């Protein structure tokens, strides 16, 4: 476990994965919420549509913190309609400089028809290599599985589902109760 994960007992508790392939972008996440070594909830929805439904997102980290960030991102999307990258950069600036937001412990993956991004509390706004990125405690396992499946004939949703299953086989903080959201790409 990373040092940043030790500061909040709810930090380690999910896997979120995005894959962009074949005219579709998909974000999937498991439903497990753990505090320490105890599973508190197995069917949490950590992936959802944002804005006017033209952006999808998923979060890893403290749930209340993530919902605060989703609300802030939705406000930025209203301010910059159709400009996910601009909205994400503006949120990242606020996240990094605002005293209250700086303490929030969460990461987000967001995507629209054109771009997929990871947002972190350190002000990073990252676009994935090859259209694949993952966050959370099982993120590295899901990412490796998705990269291995990317060159197959499987579609984006199948890759996300299979990769999250593989992560659940390895990571004790990830389960198989998966939520998926997708959008057609431009």
Swiss-Prot record:
Record keywords: Allosteric enzyme, Cytoplasm, Hydrolase, Metal-binding, Protease, Sodium, Threonine protease
Keyword Cell membrane annotated: no
EC class (word): hydrolase
Record's subcellular location: Cytoplasm
Biological process per Gene Ontology, one example term: proteolysis involved in protein catabolic process
Active site, per annotation: 14
Quaternary structure and interacting proteins, as annotated: A double ring-shaped homohexamer of HslV is capped on each side by a ring-shaped HslU homohexamer. The assembly of the HslU/HslV complex is dependent on binding of ATP.
Functional description taken from the UniProt entry: Protease subunit of a proteasome-like degradation complex believed to be a general protein degrading machinery.
Protein name, as recorded: ATP-dependent protease subunit HslV
Taxonomic source organism: Bradyrhizobium diazoefficiens (strain JCM 10833 / BCRC 13528 / IAM 13628 / NBRC 14792 / USDA 110)
